[in-house]
Amino acid sequence: MAGRSGDSDEDLLRAIRLIKILYQSNPPPNTEGTTRQARRNRRRRWRARQRQINSIGERILSTYLGRPEEPVPLQLPPLERLTLNCNEDCGTSGTQGVGSPQISVESPAILGSGTEE
């Protein structure tokens, strides 16, 4: 796979196959012919096993990909530097390239009272 240095594709595919086998080893519980409490307990145990499988899968992938489990937090500029109006000097507020273009809103005096003449 493009862009990976040090990791072979075969190792990654092997990890994916292993995770797939883990998920297939825990099918959803049968919902027929039992009391509501028994079904609820079965679903609760199934969800607990799914959480364990999720954490094992994350550990396997992080081992093969060499990435941390938690994403790196995005560094944002301080709130004091963010502005909502971009009438003058756009791009110097520290938000250049972040988000969508800003749209200036006309004041109510310019828009009128809303009644047609």
Swiss-Prot record:
Post-translational modification: Asymmetrically arginine dimethylated at one site by host PRMT6. Methylation impairs the RNA-binding activity and export of viral RNA from the nucleus to the cytoplasm.
Stretches that traverse the bilayer: none
This protein's UniProt keywords: AIDS, Host cytoplasm, Host nucleus, Host-virus interaction, Methylation, mRNA transport, Phosphoprotein, RNA-binding, Transport
UniProt-listed Gene3D superfamilies: 6.10.140.630
Biased composition (Basic residues): 37-49
Keyword check for Transport: yes
Family: Belongs to the HIV-1 REV protein family.
Free-text note on domains in this protein's UniProt record: The RNA-binding motif binds to the RRE, a 240 bp stem-and-loop structure present in incompletely spliced viral pre-mRNAs. This region also contains the NLS which mediates nuclear localization via KPNB1 binding and, when the N-terminal sequence is present, nucleolar targeting. These overlapping functions prevent Rev bound to RRE from undesirable return to the nucleus. When Rev binds the RRE, the NLS becomes masked while the NES remains accessible. The leucine-rich NES mediates binding to human XPO1.
Role noted for this protein: Escorts unspliced or incompletely spliced viral pre-mRNAs (late transcripts) out of the nucleus of infected cells. These pre-mRNAs carry a recognition sequence called Rev responsive element (RRE) located in the env gene, that is not present in fully spliced viral mRNAs (early transcripts). This function is essential since most viral proteins are translated from unspliced or partially spliced pre-mRNAs which cannot exit the nucleus by the pathway used by fully processed cellular mRNAs. Rev itself is translated from a fully spliced mRNA that readily exits the nucleus.
Name of the molecule in the record: Protein Rev
Gene giving rise to this polypeptide: rev
